[in-house]
Amino acid sequence: MSWQAYVDDHLMCDIEGHEGHRLTAAAIVGHDGSVWAQSATFPQFKPEEMNGIMTDFNEPGHLAPTGLHLGGTKYMVIQGEAGAVIRGKKGSGGITIKKTGQALVFGIYEEPVTPGQCNMVAERLGDYLLEQGL
């Protein structure tokens, strides 16, 4: 299966039990900032934004004072899982980033999708990739 198929079929799919509800954008990005696959709606990000995200995984709390920036959008960092998951909120939407051994799985949402649904979608694929040694 191609990386694009993982994004299309496992991240940008209808949320289980909520037909028509799906993430706004999603991507799988290597730890080095290289995009493995992304939805057409995923924002163009700057290298320094990806560096900040990677630093927060290695030094949890790094982004809390300044917020998480992706594609020029600022998200307030909310409770995540140190070294494993970063979650952010902006207005009626937000972001979940799950770290695997080699990649970051991004899910971005807006209402009516809930934070919990975004977490479930992004983290489920991230957990699967971890199980595969990726």
Swiss-Prot record:
- UniProt similarity note: Belongs to the profilin family.
Q: What is this protein called?
A: Profilin-3
The species this protein was found in: Olea europaea
Matching entries from Gene3D superfamilies are given as: Dynein light chain 2a, cytoplasmic
The UniProt entry's GO CC annotations, sorted and at most eight, read: cell cortex; cytoskeleton
Using the record's annotations, give every residue carrying the modification Phosphothreonine.
Answer: T114
| Any one Gene Ontology molecular-function term assigned to this protein's record | actin monomer binding
Q: Which cysteines are joined by disulfide bonds?
A: C13-C118
